[in-house]
C-alpha cells in the first residue's frame, strides 16, 4: 500500500494550514488547538528522552522505482525508525480534526469536516501501512488524544484558565 505515503506527507499541510487559519480567525479556537498539539508533542519529547524507543518493521529492500516507492525511500533515509512512541502523526492528526469539527467558524462546512475525517484516517492508516509506526504507537496516540479531547473540549481548560486569571486580576485590583 505504498500509495499511503502521500497522506503521510500531506500531514505537514494538514497540521499547519488549519492552525494558521485559527490563529488569524479565532484566537480562542487557536489556543485550544495549540494547547492540544503542544501538550502531545511535549509528552512525546519527554517519553523519547526517558525511554528511547524504535522498531524493526521496515523491509530491508524496497522494490520498484515509481514515485511512491521513491518517496518511501526518501522518508526512510531522513526519518529513522526511532523515538516513535506515541505517534505524533496520529496524535496531531486527531488534534487538528477535533479543532476543525469543534470550530464555530467551520460548523456549517460539512464538506470540510468530511474531508478532514478522510484525510485524518488516511494519515493514521499511512503510519502503519508504510511501516513508520506500529499498532501500539498508533493506539497510544489515539488514547492520548481522547484524554486531551476531554480536557480541551469537554472540560474546556482554556476558558477555565482565562476565567481564573481574570478573577485573580480582579482580586489584585481591589
Q: Where is each model-derived feature located?
A:
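Interfacial helix-start motif at the membrane-water boundary
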Residues: 1-15
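Interfacial helix-loop-helix junctions of multi-pass membrane proteins
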Residues: 61-62, 81-85, 122-149
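Alpha-helical transmembrane spans of integral membrane proteins, capturing the lipid-embedded, hydrophobic core
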Residues: 9, 13, 37, 41-45, ...
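Hydrophobic, membrane-inserted alpha-helices
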Residues: 14-18, 94-99, 118-126
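Aromatic-anchored segments of alpha-helical transmembrane domains
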Residues: 41-49, 118-128
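Short hydrophobic alpha-helices at membrane interfaces in multi-pass membrane enzymes
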Residues: 108-121
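Hydrophobic transmembrane alpha-helices
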Residues: 97-102, 145-153
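Membrane-interface loops
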Residues: 24-108, 159-174
Amino acid at each position: 500500500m505504498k500509495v499511503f505515503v502521500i497522506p503521510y506527507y500531506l500531514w505537514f499541510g494538514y497540521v499547519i494550514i488549519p492552525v494558521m487559519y485559527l490563529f488569524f480567525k479565532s484566537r480562542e479556537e487557536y489556543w485550544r488547538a495549540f494547547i492540544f498539539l503542544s501538550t502531545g508533542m511535549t509528552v512525546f519529547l519527554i517519553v523519547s528522552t526517558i525511554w528511547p524507543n524504535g522498531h524493526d518493521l521496515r523491509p530491508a529492500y524496497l522494490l520498484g522505482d515509481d514515485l511512491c516507492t521513491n518517496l518511501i525511500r526518501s522518508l526512510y533515509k531522513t526519518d529513522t525508525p526511532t523515538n516513535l512512541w506515541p505517534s505524533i502523526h496520529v496524535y496531531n492528526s486527531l488534534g487538528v480534526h477535533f479543532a476543525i469539527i469543534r470550530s464555530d467558524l467551520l460548523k456549517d462546512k460539512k464538506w470540510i469536516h468530511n474531508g478532514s475525517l478522510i484525510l485524518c484516517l488516511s494519515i493514521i492508516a499511512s503510519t502503519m501501512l508504510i511501516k513508520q509506526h506500529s499498532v501500539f504507537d498508533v493506539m497510544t496516540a489515539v488514547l492520548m488524544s481522547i484524554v486531551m479531547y476531554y480536557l480541551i473540549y469537554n472540560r474546556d481548560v482554556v476558558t477555565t484558565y482565562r476565567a481564573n486569571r481574570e478573577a485573580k486580576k480582579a482580586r489584585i485590583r481591589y
